[in-house]
Amino acid sequence: MFITFEGIDGAGKSTQVKMLRKLLISKGLEVLTLREPGGTDISESIRDILLEVKNDITPIGELLLFAASRAELVQKVIKPALSDHATVLLDRFYDSTSAYQGYGRGLDLALLHQINRIASCSLEPDITFYLDLSPEDAMIRKFSEKSLPLAFEDEELDRMERSGLEFYTRVRNGYQTIAASQPRRVVTIDATLEPDAIHRKITETIMSRRGSLLQKKEGGVEA
């Protein structure tokens, strides 16, 4: 099973990936957890380029770098893992490209869909959990002791995180549009809820769609 997690930075995706991984392993499943960009040596190198503050990258260059990272990850790691019947949990996938580079940067959505299809080898998640959070709340989480205007320019932020409030508002709107257009795949969850409450909603969704996944099996392997 292939499960992806989406949302703006600070929405709590990584926390939910860890919580679900722990649950699935306790049920005896082989679980592989990954992030985008990353997951292979080449993809991690691309991640460093994309997040480095000193790098002035054009929107189309950014798009193609994300696509290159994804192509490496899908072909070298995700597809082989799924073929071996592992459950793959991925922090970000092509919905991030549509939301960030499409709605956020203003690139042509039809072009993005073509590139996403090529880079992902037409692989589609079984379920995508979109954790919905306002940009203001996201930055408050990251910088609870700082004012919002200062936070977007803080030296601790990476290149993507410095894109600003208006950018992240467009990204959030993009995510909401994607979720509304694909309700069978994308499950929207209020990210202002407590982590345990979000986790319960995630497990309830999996139970309703793939209940057999949470049945106890022998063993359990974390990849």
From Swiss-Prot:
Which residues are recorded as binding ATP? 7-14
EC no. given is 2.7.4.9
For whether the record's keyword set contains Transferase, the answer is yes
* The keyword Nucleotide-binding is assigned to this record: yes
What is the role of the protein in this entry?
Phosphorylation of dTMP to form dTDP in both de novo and salvage pathways of dTTP synthesis.
> What HAMAP family does the annotation carry?
Thymidylate_kinase (MF_00165)
The protein here is known as: Thymidylate kinase
Q: Which organism is it from?
A: Prosthecochloris aestuarii (strain DSM 271 / SK 413)
Gene symbol of the encoding locus: tmk
